[in-house]
Amino acid sequence: MSESIPSLSALKVANSKPVVRVGIVTRNRARILPKAIQSAFSQSYPNVEVAVLDDGSDDGTSTLRSDFSAVQWQRWESSRGYLEARNHLMRTASADYYLSLDDDAWFLEGDEVALAIAYMEHHPRVGGLAFDILSPDRPNRAARSAPRPTSMFIGCGHVVRISALRECGFYAPSPGLYGSEEKDLCLRLLDGRWDIHRLPGVHVWHDKTSVARDQADQHRSGVCNDLVFALRRCPLPLILAILPVKMMSHLRFAARTHLLKPCVEGFGLFLRHALSVWQSRNPVRRETFAEFLRRSREA
């Protein structure tokens, strides 16, 4: 580990090493999934278990079982969505930590898990830890530097403390199948006085494969769920300003990226569910939301 990260390089994991479950939800990505699995098993940290949940694949993913017999394989015959699948992997874990890795994401070195767990063991109120995500649209590595607070982690590469999840709750379902679930969970963790930190330069590569991705559908869902997130968690009277600002921001982005149709459809999906979301509102404390916004601006 680089000497530029004394807060990490000086740490020692306790003799009784915590168990880490690396959870991978997959659907119809049999060609790229092995790279994610291999990168998890290549980690230097000794107490890693790898669990793969096949969410209704029909591309031969199940044939990989014989190649990776050490994996804890589970399969759903019909797809229930990645959010329910991730919740299942976290709820059924007997591990101390859950590491979320996408089926098209992988580690670049061999020490990422060891560094993450050492840091979280040394900082017992850190409930979630974000890796530094690289992707085809952000390919350049950064030097490893001191961990720092952040607003949220991304689903393709992060670690969460199982005890914090059991206290604050798992992913909350939304009308859309994609978007804002990590933001919602991180906000609730912060409201429960857990912290979210980031490891700059400790990278996970997210390949963002186009297989099983529908850009318009993801945008529609993402717009809806972002508005649901605001309605569900934003305290009064701030919600009266946040919702219109978010809608205008989504419209401007959609106009620039030629996604106006799915954006408007996302508004419609949100409006159809707005009453039920309002009735189940559970906003966080004002100071929590203000801190979340401050960290988001600094990210």
Please describe what each predicted stretch is.
Residues 76-93:
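Glycine-rich, basic loop-to-helix element that forms the pyrophosphate-binding segment
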Residues 1-39:
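N-proximal low-complexity "stem/linker" segments adjacent to membrane-targeting elements
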Residues 221, 236-299:
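Non-catalytic, C-terminal membrane-associated alpha-helical segments of glycosyltransferases
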Residues 106-142:
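Conserved donor NDP-sugar-binding/catalytic core segment of glycosyltransferases
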Residues 158-160, 164-169, 175-203:
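A short, conserved alpha-helix in the catalytic core of glycosyltransferases
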Residues 98:
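Short aromatic/hydrophobic "clamp" motif used to bind/position activated sugar donors
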Residues 38-47:
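Short, acidic, metal-binding catalytic loop of nucleotide-sugar glycosyltransferases
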Residues 39, 54-63, 105-106:
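A conserved acidic beta->alpha catalytic loop
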